[in-house]
Design a protein with these regions (language model features):
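C-terminal and inter-domain tail/linker signature
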Residues: 1-153
Length: 153
């Protein structure tokens, strides 16, 4: 497969994970897409940095936000790595990080990098704007007396 064709195939695998696993909760597809020895280099709290930990995280998110879905804004490839910038959406219908359901609609941005080798997702690095999510469900409210600082030029 040419470099461009393999890049497009890798993007399609990551997109399929985003749409079918995260967005629809299809864990049969999860088993198909993730390598047995998958490593999450930026695991979330209370998860393990392996395939089981990511499966647990995805299931937890779908329980808290049953209509969880993502809008992919763009994807780039570099070798076997696919970087995806997306916005997640959902409705807070289940407990999340100790916060009871608020039934509020949420959204937050995320950037993920996934390595794809031999048609399988082998590695993940990612950052998500969880502070924004927590603010939307009342999990973090800045104190009224918090000092306001101006940025220096």
């Amino acid at each position: 497969m040419s470099g461009n064709a393999s890049s497009e195939a890798a993007k399609a695998i990551v997109r399929r994970n985003t749409e079918e696993v995260q967005g629809r909760g299809n864990f049969d597809v999860f088993e198909e897409l993730f390598a047995h020895d998958f490593v999450d280099h930026t695991p979330q709290p209370n998860t393990t940095p392996d395939k089981a930990g990511v499966r647990r995280l995805y299931a937890y998110l779908r329980a808290a936000f049953p209509d969880f879905r993502a809008e992919i804004h763009w994807q780039l490839t570099d070798g076997d790595r696919v970087t995806t910038y997306k916005t997640y959406y959902g409705t807070h219908e289940g407990p999340f990080l100790g916060i009871a359901p608020t039934h509020r609609r949420i959204h937050f941005e995320s950037v993920d990098v996934m390595s794809v080798q031999n048609g399988k997702i082998t590695d993940h690095w990612g950052v998500g704007n969880l502070l924004s999510l927590m603010q939307q469900i009342g999990g973090w409210i800045p104190p009224a007396d918090a000092p306001q600082q101006k940025l220096k030029k």
